[in-house]
């Protein structure tokens, strides 16, 4: 049954990727703020984009579809159905497979926020994703990234907290391959990648602190995360 569910989810997302491949989202809001890999952390006035089954098939009209998605997409492990359905009803969630790029026009975004998505990409896909963020941002635009902090993992290991460290930072799953952590970063490593891509003013910040708007709501991982901001 689990293999069948995995197959359905993968094929559906792949099909969605094909039909949405040329999509470019836009907004009349100013400044233009983009929330990538957002899950259900959607904010009004932002372009909220996710590559999930929920973003692809969530329905404003038919709640029975959302109930099916709620279980199939695994959201029942993290959210109540009321919370899940409320996000869909607001129509604030857009679909795009972010492995394929960032679906906004070049030099169009003032702010890009991305929390706990980058670690789910392998090394090459992660670099391409960051290249796409650079392309999408206006000159002077701000990128804020949250990822598990690999230095925190090293500290856990040195304290003998090996099992907890493996679960947090080297997470794998039998349910859906995308939920696995495929690449990890500390600040020195991520800073070097960002600077090589052309980003400037790369700084490490703390939970809910920084220039990025909306982080009092968007930042949801206070304990083991690294928050980095940089500019184009």
Where are these regions (language model features)?
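A short acidic, Gly/Pro-enriched loop at the edge of an enzyme's catalytic core
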Residues: 96-112
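A short SAM/SAH-binding and catalytic strip from SAM-dependent methyltransferases
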Residues: 110-124
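Class I SAM-dependent methyltransferase SAM/SAH-binding core
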Residues: 30-101
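Structural motif
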Residues: 25, 85, 103-104, 194
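Active-site flanking residues adjacent to catalytic metal/cofactor-binding acidic residues
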Residues: 34, 49, 115, 145-148
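Structured loop/turn residues at beta-strand edges in well-structured enzyme cores
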Residues: 88, 107, 197-200
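Class I SAM-dependent methyltransferase Rossmann-like catalytic core
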Residues: 1-31
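S-adenosyl-L-methionine-dependent methyltransferase catalytic module, highlighting the catalytic core
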Residues: 73, 96, 101, 122-231
